[in-house]
Amino acid sequence: MSYAYLFKYIIIGDTGVGKSCLLLQFTDKRFQPVHDLTIGVEFGARMITIDGKQIKLQIWDTAGQESFRSITRSYYRGAAGALLVYDITRRDTFNHLTTWLEDARQHSNSNMVIMLIGNKSDLEARREVKKEEGEAFAREHGLIFMETSAKTAANVEEAFINTAKEIYQKIQDGVFDINNEANGIKIGPQHSPASQSLNVGGSGGNQGGNCC
């Protein structure tokens, strides 16, 4: 299917926070509870609609292990958006956010949109990180913030699409150089001058790989 723009995303965060599960829920609308760890980088894609235009999201799901960190860094450079994920039931994954964020900002373009995601919101009884803490971290570092559940699909659509809306708005504002694909944006065959309103919807797609 043709598209007006292609946006490249990267999903980052510690092992086991649900990065692959979020991607699978967004692209395939299903939850896979039993899964293997992501080895290196896996890939997914889906078409959405913003302002009446087809936008293709090309999403790279990265391994959280330190041994794969150098591979992950190479994918920052071509990304327009990043989903930085922690697990609300594991305090250590929240404590590691600063390291992930520093890594992302060091190796990406300065205009990359970063969405902070507190995943596993369905496990409220096991929560170790308050929602207010996630909100405060996002405010301090200039990030967008949402809590999600890859299991129930709560806010999963919104997380991916709101990130795309921010990227789209930056294009409208002239922040992104859309002729430089190093910014993680590619002009598609459907491209025409864009208007200012943002009406968002989505349609399904497919992705291979397992959940971590």
From Swiss-Prot:
Its domain of life reads Eukaryota
GO molecular-function term, one example from the UniProt record:
GTPase activity
**Which Pfam family is an annotated match for this chain, by its short name?**
Ras
Which compartments does it reside in?
Endoplasmic reticulum-Golgi intermediate compartment membrane; Endoplasmic reticulum membrane; Golgi apparatus membrane
Lipidated positions (S-geranylgeranyl cysteine) are 211-212
What keywords tag this UniProt record?
A: Endoplasmic reticulum, ER-Golgi transport, Golgi apparatus, GTP-binding, Lipoprotein, Membrane, Nucleotide-binding, Prenylation, Protein transport, Transport
Record-stated family: Belongs to the small GTPase superfamily. Rab family.
In terms of PANTHER family, this protein maps to: DRAB11-RELATED
| Entry protein name | Ras-related protein Rab-2
